[in-house]
Amino acid sequence: MKRVIFCIVALLLLLGNSAVAAVLKVKTPKRVEISSQAVKPYIVTIQCKAEAVKVSASEQWLGIVGEATLEAKATHSVKIWAEPNLSTTERTAEIELRGVKSGAVRTIIVSQPPYLQSITDGFPVRMMGSRYDAESWESCGICSPKGSSAVIAMVGTSGNALTTTSEKGLTVSGMGAGDYFLFAVPAENIKAGEQIDFMCTMTASEADAPKYWIFEYWDAGRWNGIESELRTAQQDSSIRYSLYNKRFRSAHNTTYAQSFTLTEPIDNGCVKVRLRALTAGSGKVKLTGSSKYISLQILRYKDAPKVSDTRRMLFIGNSFTYFYGTPFMFKEIARSQGHQVDVVASVKGGQEFCEHLQLERSIEAIVRGGYDYAFLQDTSPNAAIYADTHDPAIIASCRKINDLTLKHSPACQIIYEHTWGCPYGDYRGYGSYERLEQLLESGAKQLAKELSEYNIIVSPIGKGFTIGREQNLPLLHTDNRHQSREGAYMKACINYLTVYRTPFTESVSNCGVSPKTAKIIRQIAEQVVLGR
């Protein structure tokens, strides 16, 4: 009999606990709906009566701003954030409220309608300049590049009041740690193991913009970083970052490129990437829209051969490097041929070697080290000036940048770029294409010869431009000075062949150049470098 009574008491206690769990004393809405963009935090009023309550979200696209524990006997305005719903169907999640003492639970259903009407494959994404849907960005912090089905969004997880404006790019003010730029590209069928390349240019418009950022991509149900590529902040060893963005006295953009491979397939979904702020900053930060910079590029390598080797390459240069993103074109061409290239670039308009040696970002890029190749491009006329005057300051700067490069990358092969002639400034003051081109070529060769202890290779880009000009190829931009997209492709092809020394295969990428013109450019590049 005692045993029966004991069992009955135990059962009553169990039922009592269940009853407590069923009647958590809070007052909340049963269901909330947030917008498909969800740029601003949504406020949910929660009244805690008898005990403190812990708040959590059931899905990674949804989160709680600030403290996760609410005090008892108080009314709270809880902010929740959500990513845009980049799918074609409504989705739901739960906000769980759990009593700290009782363990009793109540849930709030959160629903979110879709942002996309349909999935239309958005690869490749190639953004130059400021071709964004600025009106959409300014109104709701989410937009698509013009002519693309890709999506760019601002996601605020910190609860800060974010301001989105368009000022020669996509600008955000007031970011807190954890807020992020989200990039998504609709994809109809991506197989497991397929590689994606992400490339962008970011700049700090004000001194107090967030400095440290981490790159992450969505795969296997979570956000993934690339641990091997992370660096440690000097002033705070707890900060492990992918890139840093800083306002310099003279603007110097952050140029970033990263490859990643998906372990799970995507069928009628989106490839998602984010740049997440690790430190807060009220100042303006933007995805640049400066003329002829790569603003954003996201590529997939659907039919590319497997990677046969991986090499790390440094690009130091000026506008003759950054117009149309020649380092990124090099990376794209190499991957289409089965070579993986990890790119680090420091590019700033008009810079000579001596000026790069005074730039924090250029020094940081060189000192990072571990490079297999370094493409060093002095300001374009310097080779011609050296051939004409033998200015000792030019060769002295060459020695200094070579020494710094090899100090941190002892096995690195240094490559100088023999650049091209142009009509600008009466052919740089030399009066004709022929005279300028002759000086540029002889000057590059003289520098390499007089610096023979460095075993420098000269990439004969200027020779390719000369042949292309004779064939009326549009290799110059409308300013008759910088490279056009076709000129950038010529430069990238010649640089590629200078490294790999093998002809192009049929799978080579055109990098956005028309197939017919791209083929002619490749033939010229092979003629110049390989003698074919």
Give the positions of each predicted feature.
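Alpha-helical cap/lid subdomain in secreted, periplasmic
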Residues: 365-485, 497
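Surface-exposed, low-complexity/disordered Ser/Thr/Gly/Pro/Asn-rich loops and linkers
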Residues: 145-192
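Conserved catalytic region of serine esterases and O-acyltransferases that act on ester linkages
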Residues: 309, 482, 486, 492-532
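A short beta-strand micro-motif common to beta-rich folds, especially ectodomain repeats
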Residues: 88-101, 285
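Terminal, low-complexity interaction segments
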Residues: 207, 223, 235-304
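Conserved SGNH/GDSL esterase-like catalytic core that processes O-acyl groups on lipids
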Residues: 312-314, 320-399
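Extended extracellular/luminal ectodomain segments enriched in beta-structured repeat modules
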Residues: 178, 187-199, 204, 208-210, ...
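Surface-exposed binding patches on compact interaction domains or structured appendages
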Residues: 23, 48-79, 222
